[in-house]
């Protein structure tokens, strides 16, 4: 019968014990935040690529003449308000982060005297309305960066684990 002897098993066991006592929630939160960054960057790039109306103001759209562009001020509002929200943990223990729009732009209307809500404008552009042709800039950016986001999260988790094992 052959005999195999392993050395260093105690060290490995200690490292596994350290890993089991590590701040797993903190590791996950850092990874999720890092995974959101490429998505946010891609959405900002997609906003920069949106077509702006030549006149500087948005004409009224209709079912026959669908809007396909936005105003310069709407675009600026989207770029300025785009960001990553703080990490949240829901009641089921899932750790989430939202990438999206906050606040209002400078286009004041009778309906929106404080300015148009940036989230409303983004949703209208992305999904379309009865008078605006949809331009799926958010959906495309998210799909385009999915693998990059997962890779960033994996790298973050692996770096945290490596740090524990190198102590």
What residue spans do the PLM features occupy?
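Short, Lys/Arg-rich flexible segments
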Residues: 1-97, 104-106, 114, 118-167
């Amino acid at each position: 019968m052959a005999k195999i002897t392993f050395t260093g098993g105690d060290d490995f066991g200690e490292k596994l014990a350290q890993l089991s006592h590590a701040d797993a929630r903190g590791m996950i939160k850092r990874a999720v935040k890092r995974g959101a960054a490429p998505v946010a960057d891609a959405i900002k790039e997609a906003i920069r690529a949106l077509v702006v109306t030549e006149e500087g103001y948005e004409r009224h759209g209709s079912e026959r003449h669908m809007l396909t562009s936005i105003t310069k001020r709407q675009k600026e509002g989207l770029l300025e308000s785009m960001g990553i929200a703080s990490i949240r943990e829901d009641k089921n223990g899932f750790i989430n982060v939202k990438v999206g729009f906050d606040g209002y732009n400078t286009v004041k209307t009778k309906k929106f005297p404080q300015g148009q809500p940036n989230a409303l404008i983004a949703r209208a552009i992305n999904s379309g309305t009865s008078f605006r042709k949809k331009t799926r800039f958010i959906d495309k950016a998210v799909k385009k960066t999915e693998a990059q986001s997962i890779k960033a999260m994996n790298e973050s988790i692996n770096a945290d684990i490596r740090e524990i094992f190198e102590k």
